[in-house]
Amino acid sequence: MTPPAVVRVSRRVRRARILVAPRRPVEVVVPPGTSDAAVERLLRRHGEWIARRTAELESRPALGLDAPGTAWLDGQPVAPPAGDRERWYRRQARERLTASVERESARLGLDGWRRIRIGDPRSRWGSCSARGTLSFSWRLVVAPAWVADYVVVHELCHLRHMNHSPSFWAMLRAAYPRHAEAQAWLRTHGPELLALNP
């Protein structure tokens, strides 16, 4: 049996992707020109994985990000802003993540970054380019500050090691002792952050 799903066409993906989030319909993101038959085959092929993943996510404690009349900052509910909520989240993310980058780069002596970009990538929380551009998901501002700080430190460490070599991980462990705890938080609650529709 094919699981029910919402199909979204995006020019930003090269191949179809399945997104499973708690208390949300399964979403299939496909490049333009993908046929209904191809989507059907994809869902059939991954049906068992979708069922397992859905059950796993539903069993996890929810943050309640989708509670009506609520916005979130630093892992805590706050009074919702008036107007465009995503724009508000992006503004908060730029302000808070920039402050985190400035603070952590000074603490670690990593000053090779050039600029900060705030976006909404679906497959990573942050990235670091060879030219020193640090990119972050605005959704990090919803997570506790220590989790967002972990992502900032992770990307700053890439200024020294543009890979995930043993040297990179050794540097990250020394720079951010709570790295494993932050990674676990993102594994548990990341799908709920990605499902947030402000």
Name the predicted role of every residue range:
Residues 1-150, 159-198:
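Active-site-proximal or metal-binding-adjacent scaffold patches in catalytic folds
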Residues 155:
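Walker B catalytic acidic pair
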